């Protein structure tokens, strides 16, 4: 099955956020350190969906879809995984020098249709959608959701092997390395949609610890024709970036709605 975007139009933080709301539920992963040096290093990563950044107070993140890409592009295992009421946690052994991509998310389908006077709803993957005959139901409405939540950690000298993209949904292609961000200096990231530059995508950036501020003091930006956004973090700290888009696609020749969300957590260091 092949799903292709016919049109991508920006919307704020679909599925993972409710932009502009003080009680927004935001998904995030936060490592114990973003940059390290030396041998035998580990990081512990927290994952949650919360009202405040990075204060777990709503629900723990599901760790079933966590993947880690090492500095050589190979998969790295998440260790000591555990989930509590409000927060999930796992460890990553940094055995090789370079940059690690830590990611969670999914690619799934939902469907709804009328049957025998009742409204039916279904959720699953592309294979089950076909195998169960869901897409053949009369009047069925199908939507696809591609979501990613990521962070990056670097041991020693940074590299870019872990930045390789998959070509599906919204993805980050760093111009500024996410572990080389400093307060007061300009940062540039590129967003891709299905492997191509994602123009006109709305992005929200918020510094953590908003629980202790009277306002979020967030930035709202829109990617340019090359999918690039440029900003300057004014203060040091951990930041949360969220982007979302919605458009029409096709599945086996039928039009469907396609939504994609992307979240990344990064750190701005003091100069």
Regions found by a protein language model. Give the residues of each.
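Short amphipathic beta-strand segments in non-cytosolic proteins
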Residues: 66-75, 202-220
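Sec/Tat signal peptide C-region and signal peptidase I cleavage site
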Residues: 18-24
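Short, aromatic- and glycine-rich surface loops/edge beta-strands on solvent-exposed regions
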Residues: 98-110, 238-245
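Glycine-centered loop-to-beta-strand initiation motif
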Residues: 84-88, 217-237
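Beta-strand-rich domain onsets/edges
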Residues: 25-43, 123-188, 192-198, 212-213, ...
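Short, ordered, surface-exposed loop/turn motifs in non-cytosolic proteins
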Residues: 59-61, 196-209
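Bacterial N-terminal signal peptides that target proteins for export
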Residues: 1-10
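Short acidic/polar inter-strand loop motif in beta-rich domains
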Residues: 107-115, 247-252
